[in-house]
């Protein structure tokens, strides 16, 4: 009888731990007030409990605090369950080009599942450049190549503009890009 009780208790603990993982950063602070770093603080309604918003998206963090398209895509973060990743290189589909392009180049296509895009090689000493990558909608496009960052940082999928500092309303740490 004691064994059955232990099995029921262990099952309840496993279910509770699986269902009590982080639900995402879109909610308005579901935990109780515990200072500035939990509940209504760091992940909730305000930075340090002062109402500025960090990941709660009601203030300085804004909607651009993470990739807007990927935050709603369950495959990119595991939904409500924790995701464990490794540093092993992915295997499968790989696309590489050893070509040199001059002038205007137009590339169109879709890659399946979640993937990455990168450019490597020598860039001009002047000019602009970048990669426009939409996670989850299949849109990958090299838009521009740049050495100098633009004055306005563009966010994907309808996220608000950041004015060369962090995201959202433009306050926070300096832009590392």
Curated annotation (Swiss-Prot):
* GO CC, one annotated term: egg chorion
InterPro entries cross-referenced by the UniProt entry: Chorion
Q: Does the keyword Nucleus apply?
A: no
Q: Which GO terms describe its biological process?
A: chorion-containing eggshell formation
Q: Name one GO molecular function term.
A: structural constituent of egg chorion
Annotated keywords? Repeat, Signal
- Stretch forming the signal peptide: 1-20
**UniProt entry tagged with the keyword Calcium:** no
Q: Which Pfam families match?
A: Chorion_1 (PF01723)
Explain the purpose of this protein: This protein is one of many from the eggshell of the silk moth.
Task: Tell me which family the UniProt entry assigns to this protein.
Answer: Belongs to the chorion protein family.
Q: What is this protein called?
A: Chorion protein ERB.1
Species in which this protein is naturally found = Bombyx mori (Silk moth)
């Amino acid at each position: 009888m004691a064994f059955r009780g232990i099995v029921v208790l262990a099952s309840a603990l496993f279910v509770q731990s699986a269902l009590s993982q982080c639900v995402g950063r879109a909610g308005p602070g579901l935990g109780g007030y515990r200072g500035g770093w939990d509940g209504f603080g760091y992940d909730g309604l305000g930075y340090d409990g002062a109402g500025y918003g960090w990941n709660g998206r009601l203030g300085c963090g804004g909607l651009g605090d993470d990739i807007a398209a990927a935050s709603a895509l369950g495959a990119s973060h595991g939904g409500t369950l924790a995701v464990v990743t490794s540093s092993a290189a992915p295997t499968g589909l790989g696309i590489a080009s050893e070509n040199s392009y001059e002038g205007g180049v137009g590339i169109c296509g879709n890659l399946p599942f979640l993937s990455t895009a990168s450019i490597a090689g020598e860039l001009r000493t002047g000019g602009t450049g970048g990669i426009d990558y939409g996670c989850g909608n299949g849109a990958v496009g090299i838009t521009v190549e740049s050495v100098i960052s633009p004055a306005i940082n563009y966010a994907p999928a309808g996220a608000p503009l950041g004015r060369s500092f962090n995201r959202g309303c433009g306050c926070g740490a300096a832009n590392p890009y």
